[in-house]
Amino acid sequence: MEKIFNHIDQHIEETIETLFKMVSQPSVSAQNYGFDKAPNLIKNILSDYGLNSQLLDTPNNGNPSIFGELKSNSNKTLMFYTHYDVQPPDPLELWESDPFKPEKRGNKLYGRGMSDDKGNIAARLAAIKAFLDIENKLPTNLKFFIEGEEEIGSRNLLGLIETYKPILKADACIWEGGGVNMSGSPLIYIGLKGGLTIKMSVNKLSVDAHSSYSPILPSSIDRLTKAMNSMKNDLGQIIIEGFHDAIIDLNKEQREAINSLPDDTKEWEDKFGVKLLGNDLESIDDLNMKLYSEPTANVNSIQSGYNGPGMKSVVPAYAECKMDFRLVPNQNPAEIYEYIKKHLIKKGFSDIEIEPLHQIFPFRTDMNSDLLDIVKTSAFEIYNKKPLVTPNMAGSGPMYEFGGLLKMPICSAGVDHPTHNMHAPNENITIDDLSLGAKHIALIMKRFSEI
């Protein structure tokens, strides 16, 4: 592998050039900005790197996905999942450079999508090019799936996979993301929480009323907050009947993996300005277990009454909120939605209207997977530090569509670092992270072909 690794280092400027080309083309899915050009740009880049590439039509006129494939003499097929859509760059005034005019400053590369997720695309292409240039072939059959709607919840991915299922089959998948923590230890996750987002609303009056009528008129915002509060007890535990019934307890290996995760409380406390340990979270093990293995119920937003400048004394006629529920493996978002509806009726909130906005299933790969063993051992060789494995991330994503529907184990491996400012101004990636990520991918490809 020494020749492959040397090639990655020797051609790093070419990799950066490819990355800059992708970052220069906006692809902001939340604003539907840049998709007249971005899909074909990515498709053509894959073709330039030797892959047979095509655009995959997305249901409901969604942003196209890009599919690339390259066969080898192997009987194994590895899938790469990434996405080319990015977050909005706002607030623009906090950027030190134009988010879509990438810049190199020292060892860092700046621009929207530099790390999430175009950096991962570039790193994987660098690994592919190294094998093709040095060995004239890949060690394993390869499929490259690049989504265009990940940042807006992959809302059309399920339908796309049902349509293109025959060409998307593979033996295993390397997920987008992954990378290292602050101390440089590789982070590998093998699962993602699912999710359900709902909108709840109530209209108690025909029009807003003067607040002097508040002693005799019902307040929609008061009614809505009571409905939301009914879903948790004073300890913040979810008390919706049936909500936890399907959850399967973590096994010994999964618990040990979570308990081996580092103590990041100080970093989080400094970042968010709160004290995390105390009350029901007595230790870092309690915190990590809650963060990575428990479902959640969270209020995203509340809209009601007057929120403009100055003051306006009213009894709000209408109120609405949006909530998201992060779900753990074996929870079904459709079933959870029904439990929420029944809960509201049972607690006397039949006047609250509820609407599902988005759902995604949870997924987790087995801790004894051959793929995980390959990703771990290769990570240790590249980064020279013991990798940390998380049975699933705290967040959600479309992993079930590949792992559950297409029946393949999934592990993450990537170029991420906590200082990359993903989803924030001045998103960046270091050249070292880009190079190490490419080498890790290359070694995974080689080892995967040998099992």
At which residue positions do the language-model features occur?
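Acidic, glycine-rich active-site loops and adjacent beta-strand->loop/helix elements
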Residues: 61, 84-86, 108, 145-154, ...
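A common structural junction motif
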Residues: 85, 231-235, 341-350
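Acidic/histidine-rich catalytic neighborhood of metal-dependent amide-processing enzymes
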Residues: 115-191
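N-terminal helical capping/dimerization or prosegment-like subdomains
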Residues: 1-90, 318, 322, 335
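An extended, acidic, His-containing surface patch that forms the Zn2+-binding/catalytic region
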Residues: 182-183, 239-318, 326-339, 347, ...
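Flexible glycine/proline-rich, aromatic-decorated loop/lid segments
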Residues: 187-203, 411-415
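A short core secondary-structure module
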Residues: 214-235
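Active-site metal-coordination/substrate-binding segment of hydrolases
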Residues: 76-143, 436
